[in-house]
C-alpha cells in the first residue's frame, strides 16, 4: 500500500470511528450570538483535535498518550477553567475562551486563528461527547466583586493568606510548585500532576488577568487537586492573595 493510500485509509478509519463514537446529544451552543453547529465542528475536530483528544474525545489520541498533563477527557464533562461553581458544567463562553486562549503549562495551544464561528462549531461538537450537557445546565457564573487597589498592604496580607491557607504545601514557599506535597498529587484519573509554578511568565493557568486568578480560587480547577475556596476565603482576602501571587512572577507586564 502506498503512503498516499495509507494516509487515506487512516482518514477514513478516523472518520468512521468518529461517526460511531459520537451519540449526538444535541446540546445547544451559542457564544456572543454565534450559534455553533456540531456537524461543522466535527470536521474541525478531525482536523485539529483528534490527534490529542482522540476520536472518542477521551483524551486517548495518538499523540495524547505522550503528553503531560494528558489532554482533556471530554466524555466526563469536567473542565478546569470555568466561571461556574465547582463540580458543575462550564458556560459555553468558558470553553470557547479556552479554545481561543489555550492552557498555560500544557500542550494545549491557542486556536485564536480559528474564526468565531469555527470555535463555536468546535464547541458544539465537543459537547456531544458527554451526556451531561443533555441533562444538566450550567449554574450561574461566580459574581466577581470589583478589585481593590493593589497596595503593599494588600500584598502583605496576601502573603499571610498564602501561609494560612497552606498554599505553600503544594505550590512551595516561593510559589515555584515545589511544596512538600507536590510529588504526591494526582488528578481525577489517578495520574501524577504537578502544582502550578507561579514564578514563570505573566499568565496563569486560565488566563492572564487578575480576575482569571480570582476565579480559580473561587471555582477550583475540576479534575485536579486544586479545590474551590469560595466557602473559606472572603473576597477581600482572595484579592489580597491575587496581589501577593503577582509579586512572585518574573517580569510582570503592567
For each predicted feature, which ranges?
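Bacterial N-terminal signal peptides
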Residues: 10-20
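Sequence/structural segment immediately N-terminal to covalent heme-attachment motifs in c-type
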Residues: 35-54, 150-176, 183-188
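Bacterial N-terminal signal peptides that target proteins for export
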Residues: 2-12
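Extracytoplasmic electron-transfer domains, predominantly the class I c-type cytochrome c fold
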Residues: 65-112, 119-126, 184-233, 238-246
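Short, non-ligating residues that shape and space the ligands of small metal-coordination modules
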Residues: 58-59, 176-177, 235
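Accessory recognition modules or surfaces
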Residues: 24-40, 50-76
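Electrostatic cytochrome c docking/interface patches
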Residues: 25-44, 133-163, 202, 252-254
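Short, solvent-exposed loop/turn and secondary-structure capping segments
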Residues: 61-64, 108-111, 134-138, 172, ...
Amino acid at each position: 500500500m502506498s503512503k498516499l493510500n495509507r494516509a487515506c485509509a487512516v482518514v477514513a478509519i478516523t472518520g468512521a470511528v468518529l461517526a460511531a463514537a459520537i451519540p449526538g446529544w444535541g446540546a445547544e451552543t451559542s457564544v456572543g450570538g454565534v450559534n455553533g453547529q456540531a456537524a461543522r465542528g466535527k470536521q474541525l475536530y478531525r482536523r485539529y483535535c483528534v490527534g490529542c483528544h482522540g476520536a472518542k474525545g477521551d483524551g486517548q489520541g495518538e499523540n495524547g498518550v505522550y503528553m503531560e498533563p494528558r489532554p482533556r477527557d471530554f466524555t466526563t464533562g469536567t473542565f478546569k477553567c470555568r466561571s461556574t461553581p465547582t463540580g458543575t458544567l462550564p458556560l459555553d463562553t468558558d470553553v470557547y475562551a479556552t479554545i481561543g486562549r489555550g492552557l498555560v503549562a500544557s500542550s494545549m495551544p491557542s486556536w485564536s486563528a480559528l474564526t468565531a464561528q469555527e470555535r463555536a462549531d468546535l464547541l458544539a461538537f465537543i459537547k456531544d461527547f458527554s451526556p451531561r450537557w443533555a441533562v444538566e445546565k450550567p449554574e450561574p457564573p461566580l459574581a466577581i466583586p470589583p478589585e481593590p487597589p493593589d497596595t503593599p498592604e494588600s500584598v502583605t496580607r496576601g502573603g499571610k493568606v498564602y501561609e494560612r491557607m497552606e498554599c505553600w504545601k503544594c505550590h512551595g514557599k516561593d510559589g515555584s510548585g515545589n511544596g512538600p506535597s507536590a510529588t504526591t498529587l494526582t488528578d481525577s484519573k489517578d495520574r501524577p500532576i504537578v502544582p502550578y509554578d507561579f514564578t514563570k511568565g505573566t499568565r496563569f493557568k486560565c488566563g492572564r488577568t487578575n480576575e482569571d486568578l480570582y476565579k480559580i480560587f473561587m471555582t477550583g480547577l475540576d479534575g485536579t487537586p486544586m479545590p474551590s475556596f469560595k466557602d473559606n476565603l472572603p473576597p477581600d482576602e482572595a484579592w489580597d492573595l491575587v496581589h501577593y501571587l503577582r509579586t512572585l512572577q518574573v517580569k510582570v507586564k503592567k
